[in-house]
């Protein structure tokens, strides 16, 4: 399982070296949702979601949406 950041405006996932990708399989794994939320805020993202992504079955679950309660 990977922990991903997705920009709500573009629909892209944060990859390595602050690049963005359409493919969640190529996105950076933040390991913990609280770390992902911290990184998203440091980057100044206003509208973002954090997902748990299961690469083996190509499935994702939204666990945090900016503007709502703290990350899981």
List the predicted regions and their residue ranges:
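Short aromatic-glycine-(Arg/Gly/Cys) micro-motifs in beta-strand/loop hairpins
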Residues: 1-23
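Residues in well-ordered beta-strands of folded domains
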Residues: 6, 31, 51
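Intrinsic disorder/low-complexity signal
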Residues: 6-8, 28, 57, 69
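Intrinsic low-complexity, intrinsically disordered segments enriched in polar/basic residues
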Residues: 14, 27-28, 52
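A short, charged, amphipathic alpha-helix used as a generic interaction element across diverse proteins
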Residues: 20-48
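Short, mixed-charge low-complexity intrinsically disordered segments
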Residues: 37-72
